């Protein structure tokens, strides 16, 4: 009995230990499922959030960058300093942050006090080595004329900048600053960009044909007889007809003889010289200058200038045309945009006095900041050709004689001794224009002007058969050339100095000077006359 009871108790214990309660198993499974599902949901949410933010960042445009790049759209690659000590260390970082803080203080005070550099300077995070460049740019656009001139002077004296800093100035400055740099003696040529690409020529066309079309597009009515003659002669000639008629012109002494003598040894430039001579006459009329600009004449003349670098006569006529167009202030922006300022800035530094003088006339007519006068065709300033703060005490006017020219008359006589045998001191003293070289050096306060007019023995019956030259007509023409219209009044630009001195070439030059300065319209009168 007792054995049976013991067996029953043992069986109950075994049954109780092997069959756990079902409710505990169910809650354990639920907890495991919750943990797995929660981890999956949380990880998926984080992943989706990251992808959405990354996609939003990729497709969103930072407008602050666009505003910042408005002032730095032309900046070239920055150079890295070779001194590693400047790029590392706490001291360098502190100095950089201090400079930024100072600039912010200056910008804030500029806004309050309305300083000239307030707006652009305060909105751009400019590096330390660029502050001077941007301040000079802002200073060059000041409303105060003295401030602008000082900025241009400081730019011209900068010779330690990197290439990209010169290009930055060239691309960001206004036309007045660019012209001022071109007329500054010490300016670096890196300030001037290359001229814009020239438009391509039309199919089956040439520069000769384009030049003839430009000449034909100019007004042909109400013209002087000589202008009509030059125009008709240029339009009627071509390379083939000129070759066929050349013998006749020489044999019978026609009007083509002076042309044939002036063409030099460049046959390809012969017909172009005909057209350029005619366009020079047209460019003396203001309305015709507008037509030349509207019909692409500035670009075409630039193409000819580049093609005939070895032909000074072609280049001289082209510069005469540009100089005449520069007399019209409303064409200044077109002349600057076409790249002529860069070309003339390089020509100003030429060793050839004639080329430099033509370029100086063009830039002086473009410069309305420091030059009040306008130099007509045939008037060349030999000194000063650059901007100067020195006041002009006297004008020296050189008028050449019958067989002379504006530059040829005043050259030094060639020495019979060979150049190799000359001492170095003698070579240094030699000059092709002594008023520009010697007189300007001895008397820097002078303005030295040379006047050119047509004068060869054959020009008594000039290249234009309808023109009759006389002493009175020549002097009258020079008197008109020396008169420069300022605003609405016709005044004589020589009247701005205290004294006038004449440099006269022989007897003929003396009589021309007498006729010019004894006329009623001339404000200058000789102090003493000698018979």
Curated annotation (Swiss-Prot):
It is a single-pass membrane protein. The keyword Cell inner membrane does not apply. Keywords: Endoplasmic reticulum, Lipid biosynthesis, Lipid metabolism, Membrane, Mitochondrion, Phospholipid biosynthesis, Phospholipid metabolism, Transmembrane, Transmembrane helix. Gene3D superfamilies: Leucine-rich Repeat Variant. The keyword Transmembrane helix applies. InterPro entries: ARM-like, ARM-type_fold, SERAC1. One of its GO terms (biological process) is phospholipid biosynthetic process. It is found in: Mitochondrion membrane; Endoplasmic reticulum; Mitochondrion. The chain crosses the membrane at residues 33-50. It comes from the Eukaryota. GO terms for cellular component: endoplasmic reticulum; membrane; mitochondrion. Facilitates the transport of serine from the cytosol to the mitochondria by interacting with and stabilizing Sideroflexin-1 (SFXN1), a mitochondrial serine transporter, playing a fundamental role in the one-carbon cycle responsible for the synthesis of nucleotides needed for mitochondrial DNA replication. Plays an important role in the phosphatidylglycerol (PG) remodeling that is essential for both mitochondrial function and intracellular cholesterol trafficking. Belongs to the SERAC1 family. This is Protein SERAC1.
């Amino acid at each position: 009995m007792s054995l049976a009871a013991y067996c029953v108790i043992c069986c109950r214990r075994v049954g109780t230990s092997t069959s756990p309660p079902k409710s505990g198993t169910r809650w354990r499974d639920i907890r495991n499922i919750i943990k797995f599902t929660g981890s999956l949901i949380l990880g998926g949410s984080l992943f989706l959030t990251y992808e959405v933010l990354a996609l939003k960042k990729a497709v969103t445009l930072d407008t602050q960058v666009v505003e910042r790049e408005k002032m730095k759209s032309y900046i070239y690659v920055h150079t890295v300093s070779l001194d590693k000590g400047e790029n590392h260390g706490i001291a360098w970082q502190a100095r950089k942050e201090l400079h930024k803080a100072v600039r912010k203080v200056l910008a804030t005070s500029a806004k309050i006090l309305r300083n000239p550099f307030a707006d652009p300077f305060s909105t751009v995070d400019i590096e330390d080595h660029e502050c001077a460049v941007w301040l000079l740019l802002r200073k060059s656009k000041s409303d105060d004329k003295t401030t602008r001139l000082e900025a241009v002077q400081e730019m011209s004296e900068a010779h330690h900048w990197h290439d990209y800093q010169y290009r930055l100035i060239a691309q960001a400055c206004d036309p007045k600053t660019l012209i001022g740099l071109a007329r500054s003696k010490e300016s670096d040529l890196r300030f001037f960009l290359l001229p814009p690409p020239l438009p391509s020529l039309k199919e089956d066309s040439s520069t000769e044909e384009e030049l003839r079309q430009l000449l034909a597009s100019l007004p042909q009515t109400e013209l002087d007889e000589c202008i009509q003659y030059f125009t008709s002669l240029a339009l009627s000639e071509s390379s083939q007809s000129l070759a066929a008629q050349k013998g006749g012109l020489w044999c019978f002494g026609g009007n083509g003889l002076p042309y044939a003598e002036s063409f030099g040894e460049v046959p390809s430039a012969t017909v172009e010289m005909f057209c350029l001579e005619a366009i020079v006459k047209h460019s003396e009329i203001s309305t015709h200058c507008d037509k030349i600009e509207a019909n692409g004449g500035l670009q075409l003349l630039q193409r000819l200038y580049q093609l005939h670098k070895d032909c000074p006569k072609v280049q001289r006529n082209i510069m005469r045309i540009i100089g005449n167009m520069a007399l019209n202030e409303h064409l200044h922006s077109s002349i600057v945009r076409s790249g002529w300022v860069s070309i003339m800035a390089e020509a100003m530094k030429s060793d050839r006095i004639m080329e430099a003088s033509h370029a100086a006339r063009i830039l002086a007519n473009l410069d309305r900041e420091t030059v009040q006068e306008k130099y007509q065709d045939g008037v060349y300033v030999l000194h000063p050709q650059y901007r100067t703060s020195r006041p002009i005490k006297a004008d020296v006017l050189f008028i050449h004689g019958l067989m002379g020219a504006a530059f040829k008359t005043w050259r030094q006589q060639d020495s019979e001794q060979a150049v190799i045998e000359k001492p170095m001191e003698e070579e240094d003293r030699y000059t092709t224009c002594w008023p520009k070289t010697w007189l300007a050096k001895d008397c820097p306060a002078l303005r030295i002007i040379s006047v050119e007019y047509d004068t060869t023995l054959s020009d008594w019956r000039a290249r234009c058969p309808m023109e009759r030259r006389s002493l009175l007509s020549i002097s009258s023409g020079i008197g008109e050339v020396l008169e420069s219209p300022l605003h609405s009044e016709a005044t004589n630009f020589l009247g701005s100095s205290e004294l006038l001195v004449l440099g006269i070439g022989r007897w003929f030059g003396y009589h021309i000077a007498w006729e010019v300065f004894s006329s009623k319209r001339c404000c200058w009168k000789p102090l003493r006359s000698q018979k």
